[in-house]
Amino acid sequence: MKDTIRQLIQQALTQLVTEGVLPEGLTPAIQVENARDKTHGDFASNIAMMLAKPAGMKPRDLAEKIIAALPTSADISKAEIAGPGFLNFFQNTDALANRLDAALADDHLGVHKAGPVEKVVIDMSAPNLAKEMHVGHLRSTIIGDSVARVLEFLGDDVIRQNHVGDWGTQFGMLLAYLEENPITSDELSDLENFYRAAKKRFDESEEFATRARGLVVKLQAGDPDCLALWTRFKDISLSHCQKTYELLNVKLTMADVMGESAYNDDLANVVADLKSKGLLVESQGAQCVFLEEFKNTEGEPLPVIVQKADGGYLYATTDLAAVRYRSNTLQADRALYFVDQRQALHFNQVFEVARRAGFVGHPMKMEHMGFGTMNGADGRPFKTRDGGTVKLIDLLTEAKERAYALVKEKNPSLAEDELRKIGEVVGIGAVKYADLSKHRTSDYSFNFELMLNFEGNTAPYLLYAYTRVAGVFRKLGKGFDEVDGNIVLQAAHEQDLAARLAQFGEILNNVADKGTPHVLCSYLYDLAGLFSSFYENCPILAAETAEQQQSRLRLAALTGRTLKQGLELLGLETLERM
């Protein structure tokens, strides 16, 4: 609807330019917002106040001219002027009802992408291999997954890339320790303890550390024995990751892995190409690119180091190779990097070097989708009681058990297998939703009690809200798609619910544009609250007429489908009953 109003305003402005009321050459960004007070309409625009000065008119006088020039539209019942010159638009409820009927008949709920369909690379999760995933990997994994789901729903061609840390000095350390302590695959599956023991040996023995560094060189040179052991470590690590992804209900598979090692063969070429473009400067033996846009506190340009003095490559080199691959080989239109916002400087530098070096041959927007940290109750990074790193799988297991105990207490008569299933859906959903509902760039404190609460903006509340809608249809023995008739919007609670339902597409396009799933969370929470008010004030099963019952059932069906689809786009499973 906002796009429709923008188009109407644009047509009016074009008419006013033709009439000489407005000067030529104006290209204003027409803003249309939801009206705060429904008595003043459904949508508002400040365009008259924006253009009053170039028009040489008072805002209200210009607003009158704009309203007079607005084309008629079946979607708008009337437009009015408010305050200093706001334009307020009232939706036509019959047109709104028709849109919702069409949405209910559509597999995509009437949602379409606002712009052209694109090929989008999502760089997400990216754990370091050779040890298990920890809680620090949660945000990149689930935020990236949710945005990828939304983009796919809108029609984009999404390529997920799990840029795992599968190369580097830690593997030399592990290989050296494995040489000293040959063990079985079963023993090796306990990666955390094996890594800890190898790290202890590395820190305590200079001879061991020297041998480990030598094995890194052999590994990088393609030594068959080293490569075989490295592959063994990598496969075990990835199997650990895959179990976590499956428990999280995240759409990442082995086929999506494109780790650091995948770019090894191109690293020397990256350095050579930077040199041929005249971008490299040697500094203390290292090969660097200096960019004037990025300076230290003394005002000196910061180096982007692509090759160390000993010939080794760095993260920047690998990331530059990845940019080139994603642009030139994958032909991506966008590349979204879901990486901790503390890496913002790194990515801004890499993106600028890539542009200057001509590595972005196919026009590709590069966007760092940074995020804040998940902290403990004390506001510090989340740790175990003894200060260790919390394994992600352990956190999720605890969430399942806590949710199971909570559900069993409320529903002791349910069968054990159903209790376990509900516990898993609620527990995993609670952890994910608590994260996704926060603004991506914000830090937040992890709190089981808050996230498992059945009140407030939580997964349990939304999951229960969905089962409440499903329960209406279960009583009737019908599905969401088995309701005849048409939507008729008469009561205020019907109109409020309908207006919010109609905004689903706008919300999803917002998430796709900015990479912010919390916007979808807020929408679903608001929608659930509006349905609750509608359900309490507009009887469905006890409606006054058959037509009224069908209309309200159709509103309920569209609410149920929207809640289910929205939760699925967040990566949350739903339940038919709790």
Swiss-Prot record:
Keywords: Aminoacyl-tRNA synthetase, ATP-binding, Cytoplasm, Ligase, Nucleotide-binding, Protein biosynthesis
PROSITE patterns: AA_TRNA_LIGASE_I (PS00178)
ATP-binding recorded as keyword: yes
Pfam families for the chain: Arg_tRNA_synt_N, DALR_1, tRNA-synt_1d
Organism superkingdom: Bacteria
GO terms for MF: arginine-tRNA ligase activity; ATP binding
Catalysed reaction, written as an equation: tRNA(Arg) + L-arginine + ATP = L-arginyl-tRNA(Arg) + AMP + diphosphate
GO-annotated biological processes: arginyl-tRNA aminoacylation
GO cellular component: cytoplasm
Residue window of motif 'HIGH' region: 127-137
Subcellular location: Cytoplasm
InterPro entries referenced in this protein's UniProt entry, alphabetically: aa-tRNA-synth_I_CS, Arg-tRNA-ligase, Arg-tRNA-synth_N, Arg-tRNA-synth_N_sf, ArgRS_core, DALR_anticod-bd, Rossmann-like_a/b/a_fold, tRNAsynth_Ia_anticodon-bd
Family: Belongs to the class-I aminoacyl-tRNA synthetase family.
Assembly and binders: Monomer.
Official protein name in the record: Arginine--tRNA ligase
Organism, as annotated: Pseudomonas entomophila (strain L48)
The gene coding this protein: argS
